[in-house]
């Protein structure tokens, strides 16, 4: 009905804290019980495939939850994490994987393969790849050669076992070759999120129309680098939480003024080269920020202005 080709699921591995949205895992081989049994997850993916919809899953190869019933100090010692807290603790308060250990690399490679093999996901989006390219994502600390090698080996291995699977990097750096094949010196991903496009376009449409003539570069700058990689354009979950406001609410002006601007922004996105990704709720003009503890405000579809916006987004998807 809405003409989507794929669904991307936020992490489905078991995790203790709802507020982590699944990005702080304890069970890398265990689907979370929040949504049912493993067999029910397989059935969901199968029914999506029967409807012509692919399913992509978020995978977290950077860090894991600090809960002691997970991987932390698994046998009383630091098996999976760094013993040095200065490098072992992530910015989210979780434990960084120690990728220099072969056993840790094999564990993560096996986990990624498990989701593709057992549940027939059509792709994996790897979270926080910038934290693997540079030491804890800090370019000033230099490239992390060990984790780059880990990414190359994992991507090559997954492609050899699942040639049609999409491998997507969430990466905010300018590191070259993220989407080039490994045998050509790249990291072996198929696509990379274009976070710069998202931030630039949102800033443009947040500004008052009378000042936008000085900000045209925010619409055009992406074409300066676009063909260096294979990009995926996204308006994602990170932009509709923690006081940032929803996509619709970011638009300049009063309530009624926001809709035509959001329509223009999405039309520009659809006309721009690259794959498209849109977080749930954006398609009908969600007004409240996303909160993992409640569902989206579907009642907004009873309002003509939101229904018309949803129909417009549906038409754009059909055109795409």
Model-derived features: positions:
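Bulky hydrophobic/aromatic packing residues
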Residues: 76-78, 91-93, 225, 290, ...
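A short, structured beta-strand-centered segment in the mid-to-C-terminal lobe
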Residues: 97-98, 102-105, 301-311
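Substrate-binding/active-site clefts of carbohydrate-active enzymes
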Residues: 1-121, 125-143
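Conserved alpha/beta catalytic core and glycan-binding cleft of carbohydrate-active enzymes
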Residues: 120-122, 134-295, 300, 308, ...
């Amino acid at each position: 009905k809405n003409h989507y080709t794929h669904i991307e699921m936020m992490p489905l591995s078991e995790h203790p804290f709802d507020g982590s949205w699944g990005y702080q895992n304890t069970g890398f081989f265990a689907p979370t019980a929040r949504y049912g049994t493993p067999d029910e997850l397989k059935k969901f993916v199968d029914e999506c495939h029967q409807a012509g919809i692919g399913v992509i899953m978020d995978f977290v190869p950077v860090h894991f939850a600090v809960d002691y019933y997970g991987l932390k100090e698994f046998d009383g010692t630091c098996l999976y994490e760094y013993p040095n807290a200065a490098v072992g603790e992530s910015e989210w308060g979780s434990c960084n994987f120690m990728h220099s250990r072969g056993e840790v690399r094999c564990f993560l490679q096996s986990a990624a393969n498990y989701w593709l093999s057992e549940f027939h996901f059509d792709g994996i989006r790897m979270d926080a790849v910038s934290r693997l390219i540079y030491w804890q994502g800090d370019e000033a600390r230099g490239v992390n050669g060990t984790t780059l090698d880990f990414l190359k080996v994992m991507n090559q291995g997954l492609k050899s076992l699942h040639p049609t699977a999409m491998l997507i990097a969430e990466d905010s750096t300018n590191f070259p070759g993220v989407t080039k094949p490994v045998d050509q010196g790249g990291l072996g991903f198929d696509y990379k999120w274009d976070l710069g496009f998202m931030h630039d376009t949102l800033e443009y449409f947040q500004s008052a129309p009378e000042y936008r003539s000085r900000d045209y570069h925010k619409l055009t700058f992406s074409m300066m680098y676009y063909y260096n990689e294979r990009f995926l354009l996204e308006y994602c979950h990170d932009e509709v939480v923690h006081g940032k406001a929803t996509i619709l609410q970011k638009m300049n002006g009063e309530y009624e003024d926001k809709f035509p601007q959001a329509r223009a922004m999405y039309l520009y996105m659809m006309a721009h080269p690259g794959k498209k990704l849109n977080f749930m709720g954006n398609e009908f003009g969600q007004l409240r920020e996303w909160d993992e503890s409640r569902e989206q405000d579907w009642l907004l579809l009873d309002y003509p202005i939101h229904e018309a916006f949803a129909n417009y987004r549906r038409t754009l998807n059909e055109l795409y």
